Swiss-Prot record:
Cofactor binding summary note: Binds 1 Mg(2+) ion per subunit.
GO molecular function, one term: glucosamine-1-phosphate N-acetyltransferase activity
Gene it is expressed from: glmU
Main location: cytoplasm
Organism the protein comes from: Mycolicibacterium gilvum (strain PYR-GCK) (Mycobacterium gilvum (strain PYR-GCK))
Broad class of enzyme this protein falls into: transferase
Binding positions (acetyl-CoA): A388, N394, Y395, S413, A431
Protein name from the UniProt record: Bifunctional protein GlmU
Length: 498
């Protein structure tokens, strides 16, 4: 479809969303609605792609250009200065095309997120096969409220579209509706647009009126009925956004299941459209896989896990974990209750256990951080073990510094690494050690001094407390026990003769 142009209408105010964010930039399944529309039409390979913006153009136009860059194609921006209706918006879009363009013009909207390339391709194929001047998508809805109704002759020919506000009672009973997706011959479109009028309930230039004008000129009008209404459903408010988001998620989840992924509870599992998952992976309830997350094969993910832009290697287990912009190596085990902040890279067969938080940290193959530890701005080698309750002290209030831990290192519980500091390969640290200076390879670092017990401190400093009473009772019990032990071990007195 190289000799074609696509015009995406994204100029509406979207007032029913009641949001400072433009309607077409609201997201579902990891993409804005505009991005969904642009991905669908980009699959057709059109020569020109025009996005018409109006209100909120300062947000919508840059977003459209960024999406185009991601898709690797040029996007032209057309501005609708005044909101004068869909017909006027398309006219603004045509102005962005070269004057000598003579191909097919596909018109769609930026708020139809489930519309796919296959449906658009079917529209184009029918348009070409029938040598039509205009071809439109229609669907049938149980509740057609808000949609334009399709008007047909007794023999089924499409003769026009009537908008809800202008429809009679009998016309409002029609359940076949306009999907607002069209393929026009550019000549027929230009001619019809030049004759649109505002004599309607909204006082606007309706693109839908172009259908009757083309037919009145003797042009060929064809329709493609879409049996799945969700594919062409639009979004006007947050209720519809949530409904379509749930429907899209259901389809995404089902596609992964058919590809060999076990999803235990689809109702509580949310997967963005750009996520990839390998075969024989099990996704447990309450899991969200978001953004560009890529999960390998034979993994176990969840329950109650959220991963955003995280790469998970084959055979890894990730349990009750929240992770963002991180990497988890093959065979690694993460969780439960682990927090992976951006920049975390866990090597193959590594472990990050309960209540471990990591940030901007590289953790080598086979290294374990089992529990209750913060690892920030650190590089840890292979097959090391970080004891419980250790803290990588990376921030002095002004500057963040890195800690480097070698391979085959064993650190005792409650070790503090005050960055910048380096611990050499094979070194050990004692429990409760504060590492302020580098530790040579193979050394044992101990910073705690000898333990000192201050006898009677509680009785003197906390008299009358429960602690003092318990200590006094223990002391008394100890004296009694000592006396009993002394009696048991005492030698009997020597016998005397009489």
């Amino acid at each position: 479809m190289s000799d074609a142009a696509v015009v995406i209408l994204a100029a509406g105010a979207g007032t029913r969303m009641k949001s400072d964010t433009p309607k077409v930039l609201h997201s579902l399944a990891g993409r804005s609605m505009l991005a969904h529309s642009m991905h669908a039409v980009a699959g057709l390979g059109p020569r020109h792609l025009v996005v018409v913006v109006g209100k909120h153009r300062e947000q919508v136009a840059p977003a459209a250009l960024q999406i185009g860059e991601h898709l690797g194609r040029t996007v032209d921006i057309a501005v609708q200065e005044e909101q004068r209706g869909t017909g006027h918006a398309v006219e603004c879009g045509l102005a962005a095309l070269p004057a000598d363009f003579h191909g097919v013009v596909v018109v769609t909207a930026g708020d139809v997120p489930l519309l796919d390339t296959d449906t658009l391709a079917q529209l184009i194929a029918t348009h070409d096969a029938e040598s039509a001047d205009v071809t439109l998508l229609t669907t049938t809805m149980a509740d057609p409220t808000g949609y334009g109704r399709i008007l047909r002759t007794q023999d089924g020919e499409v003769i026009g579209i009537v908008e809800q506000a202008d429809a009679t009672e009998s016309q409002r009973a029609i359940t076949e509706v306009n999907a607002a997706v069209y393929a026009f011959g550019v000549g027929a479109l230009r001619s019809a647009l030049s004759r649109l009028k505002t004599d309607n309930a909204q006082g606007e230039l309706y693109l839908t009126d172009a259908i009757a004008l083309v037919r009145g000129d003797g042009g060929t009008v064809r329709a493609v009925h879409v049996d799945d209404p969700a594919l062409v459903a639009g979004v006007n408010d947050r209720v519809q956004l949530a409904d379509l988001g749930a429907e899209l998620n259901r389809r995404v989840v089902a596609a992964h299941q058919r590809a060999g992924v076990t999803i235990v509870d689809p109702a509580t599992t949310w997967i963005d459209v750009d996520v990839t998952i390998g075969r024989d992976t099990v996704v447990r309830p309450g899991t969200q896989l978001l953004g560009a997350t890529a999960v390998g094969g034979r993994c176990e993910i969840g329950p109650d896990t959220t991963l955003t832009d995280v790469t998970v290697g084959d055979g890894a287990q990730v349990i009750r974990t929240h992770g963002t912009s991180s990497q988890i190596g093959a065979g690694a085990v993460v969780g439960p209750f682990t927090y992976l902040r951006p920049g975390t890279a866990l090597g193959a067969d590594g472990k990050l256990g309960a209540f471990v938080e990591t940030k901007n940290a590289t953790i080598g193959t086979g290294t374990k951080v089992p529990h209750l530890t913060y690892v920030g701005d650190a590089d840890i080698g292979e097959h090391s073990n970080i004891g419980a309750s250790s803290v990588f002290v990376n921030y002095d209030g002004e500057t963040k510094s890195r800690t480097t831990i070698g391979s085959h290192v064993r650190t005792g519980s409650d070790t503090m690494f005050v960055a910048p500091v380096t611990v050499g390969d094979g070194a050990y640290t004692g429990a409760g050690t504060v590492i302020r200076d580098d530790v040579p390879p193979g050394a044992l670092a101990v910073s705690a001094g000898p333990q000192r017990n201050i006898e009677g401190w509680v009785a003197r400093k906390r008299p009358g407390s429960k602690a003092a009473a318990a200590a006094e009772a223990a002391a008394a019990d100890g004296d009694t026990a000592a006396a009993d032990r002394a009696a048991a071990t005492a030698k009997p007195a020597p016998a005397t003769g009489e």
